[in-house]
Amino acid sequence: MKFWRFVQILFFLGVAAVGLVVAVMIANADDTTLFDRMQLPDGDPNKLNYYIQPAPNGNEKVPFPTIFDPASVYLSLVVPAYNEEKRLPKMLDETLNYLKSREEKDKSFTWEIVIVNDGSKDKTKEVVLNYAKEYPNIFLLNQPVNMGKGAAIQAGCLHVRGELVLMLDADGATKIDDFEVLEKEIKSLMKTTNQAIVIGSRAQNEKAKRTPLRKFLSIGMHTLIVLSGVHGIRDTQCGFKLFTRESCKMIFMNQHVQRWCCDPEILVIARRLGMKISELPVEWNEIDGSKMKISGMIKMATDLIKIAIFHRVGAWKIRDRRH
C-alpha cells in the first residue's frame, strides 16, 4: 500500500514539474519573429536589407524588394542553402533548363531564383555569384551566420517578386518538373481564394526511395507533428511547397521557428488562418549528404512541442506585423 502511495506521489510531482516547465516556457516565449527584426533601423547589424549581385567592379548591394509590393514576375523560387557548393550546381542546372524551356514556350512565364546562403563555411556564396553573372534573375541573399533552414526560407520568402512562390531544396531531391503538378492545383484553388498552398508529398509516391532508418524516424516525427496541431497532411517535411503571394505574406511574417521544424509551423499558421492546403505526390529521391542528425531531431522535437503549446495558448500570436 505504501508503495502505490509513493508511486502516486511521484506521478503527481512529475505532472507538477511538467506543468511548471510549460509555464516557464510560456512566460519566456519570445513573440518576436525574423520579420520583426527585418524592420530594424538601417545600420543595425541584425538587419538584412539587400541582395548581393555581381557587378563589373565587384559585387553590388541591391535593395530588397518586399512581399508587400505588387508581384512583378510570375514565379519566385526560394532555395535555402548551407554548405551546398557540391550539390547546388546540379540542382541549378536542372532548374534553369526547365525555366528556360518554359520561358521559350511562354514569354509571360517570368521568374527569379532567390538563393539564401545560410552562413555557409564552404564556397556556396561563390557558386551562386558565378551563376548570377550569367543569369541576372538569380539573386543571392547572404546571411553572415548560420541562422537555420527556417530563417533562410523566411528571409527569402519575405523578399520575393513572384505571383507564385516555390520553396525547394538545394540538393535537388525533388525535381523541378513537378512544379507543373503543383501549379495546376494552385490555379484551381485560386479560383475561390488568394490564400492557398500546395505541398509536395513523398509519402504518397511509390517512387520515393528512403532508407528504413529514415522511414522509422519519419513515423516518430509525424506523430509529434500531429500532436503539434497539423492534421490531414501526410508529409509536412518535403521541401517542395508552392504558395500564392498572399499566403506567403501572411505565413512568413508570423513564422517563429528558425530551424528544421519550420515546415510544421508553416502549416499550423496556414490552418489557423483558414487557408486552403492541398497535398500532391511528387517524385523524390534521398540524396547523399543530408545534414539532419540526431541532435537535429531532438531540436525538432523540442520545437514541435513549442509550436503545439505557444500557438494554442496565444504566446505566439498571428497578426499583421506591418503595424
UniProtKB/Swiss-Prot annotation:
GO terms for cellular component: endoplasmic reticulum membrane. Pathway: Protein modification; protein glycosylation. Residues 27-323 are cytoplasmic. Keywords: Endoplasmic reticulum, Glycosyltransferase, Membrane, Signal-anchor, Transferase, Transmembrane, Transmembrane helix. One of its GO terms (biological process) is protein N-linked glycosylation. It is found in: Endoplasmic reticulum membrane. The chain crosses the membrane at residues 6-26. It is a single-pass membrane protein. Dolichyl-phosphate beta-glucosyltransferase involved in the glycosylation of glycoproteins through the synthesis of dolichyl beta-D-glucosyl phosphate which serves as a sugar donor for transfer of three glucose residues to the Man-9-GlcNAc-2-PP-dolichol precursor to N-glycans. This is Dolichyl-phosphate beta-glucosyltransferase ALG5A. The lineage of its organism: Eukaryota, Metamonada, Parabasalia, Trichomonadida, Trichomonadidae.
